């Protein structure tokens, strides 16, 4: 099986948790976050870590997001940021884009613009209890 490349956009609690899980597997991880301390912390396990704005198309392209098999838009705080990140990933030709959201309204928006999977961990955990 070929080595997969996974992009993580936003390294809050959710994004960091994904990296901690993925680093146990044979995959390349590209991470983008606007906090250099977080990128520096994970640098040993990243194929590439980029400090910058996940809504910046040129930055995502320069980071190599277009080479990813899957990208997780791990920020759910700001709908505009999530929308732009999903749109840019799809424009860059990423085959599978997963987005995290906080509300069902945001979920509908991101599904409408082309996110392949939209998850709401808080909502889903609340439903499963």
Report the location of each language-model feature.
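Cytosolic regulatory regions of ion transport systems
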Residues: 1-129
């Amino acid at each position: 099986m070929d080595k997969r490349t996974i992009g993580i956009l936003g390294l809050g609690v959710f994004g960091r948790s994904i990296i901690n899980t993925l680093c146990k597997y044979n995959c390349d991880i590209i991470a983008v976050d606007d906090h250099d301390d977080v990128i520096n912390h994970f640098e040993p396990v990243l194929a590439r870590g980029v400090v910058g704005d996940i809504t910046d198309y040129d930055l995502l392209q320069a980071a190599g997001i277009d080479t990813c098999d899957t990208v997780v838009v791990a920020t759910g705080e700001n709908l505009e940021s999530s929308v732009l990140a999903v749109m840019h990933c799809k424009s860059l030709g990423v085959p599978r884009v997963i987005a995290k959201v906080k509300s069902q309204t945001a979920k509908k928006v991101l599904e409408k613009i082309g996110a392949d999977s939209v998850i709401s961990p808080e909502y889903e955990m609340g439903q499963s209890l």
